[in-house]
Amino acid sequence: MGICPHKYDIIVFMNHIKNYAYTHTPLQFDFKQTVERFFVEEIPLYTFTNTGNYLILKIQKSNMSTWKLITVLAKATGLQERDIGYAGLKDKNATTIQYISIPKQYERELNKNLTTEKVVILERSYNKAPIKIGHLKGNAFSIVLHHINEKDAKFFTTTAKKMQKEGIPNYYGYQRFGEDSRSYLQGKEIAQSGKRLKGSKEKLLVSAYQSYLYNKWLGQRVKLSTIIASNNTLQAAKKLDYPEELVKVLAKQVQFFKLFIGDAVIPYPYGKLSFVKDMHQSSQAFLQKKISPTGLLCGANVERAKSDAYYLEEAYDDTELNTLKGDRRFAWIWPKDVETKYECNGKKLKVEFYLPKGSYATTFLEEIGKFSLKNM
């Protein structure tokens, strides 16, 4: 009961970069990513030991990117930028809190020379090892939306709580693709040149190409799941050009995002990758938030999906991309700790929530609002 979709069938889906999983009417609100309206705090992966050779700094910064912060700290301490540890990149246009590590013997130089008002050290600790990229659980967000009426604010809250329970597609946000949203084209050209990557900029461009292909694949899977959810078995089978028996099995899955044989899944929020062999069993685990399907970030040394699931992945897999390590990314995530507070007089809605590492607050807001936040 396998599938072998025509290449054309898949390419039709590729026209849709962003497909929303939820079907409610779009909401109206004003979003701006500014230091006054966008707050994010990094949640560390582990508790620091408070002993060891590395100074751990909990830093609040505003109107400053992580790259700029590292440059400022390097200048203040005399360290090379590569010797300053961080877990993830934070945007410039926000008020952010993140953790940084430096060798503790440079603490005196830091105290003496760090003078900018844009950087505030909130806490200090020590650890036996430096912070490395990826060493975070996730991020806690607090965002203020403007020009939202009370009715929409209530519906926003209800929808956000529903998404906390049922989950959302884990698209990369528009920030990943540069100001003109076309950085992935440069990345594709670099990736397919076969040349070794030069510097962090080329790596960033190639990773944008990886992310673009992933978003295309995810949009196709969301569209596919929408067709199954919104049509009877016969209609869905015709629209997808799938065997009716397969669609019947897929339609029995309670969750929105349908799993296929061979889908690469990982225990949520972390664990060892495995492949779907029994759709019913995996569907139950998915419903219980025990596992989540993953999408391909094509590159070197990465596991591909298998069987039916790979037919759906193949159109978004660039086997020429070997200059950057590949990976798999959760396709479906569950926001946590969702809270809202509405200010009637100012028509403002304060939204607080937590997302796992690598997930975008703007993606969550776009799924609720049903419109792009880019260039608002």
List each language-model region with its residue ranges:
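Non-catalytic, substrate/partner-engaging modules appended to enzymatic cores
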Residues: 4-376
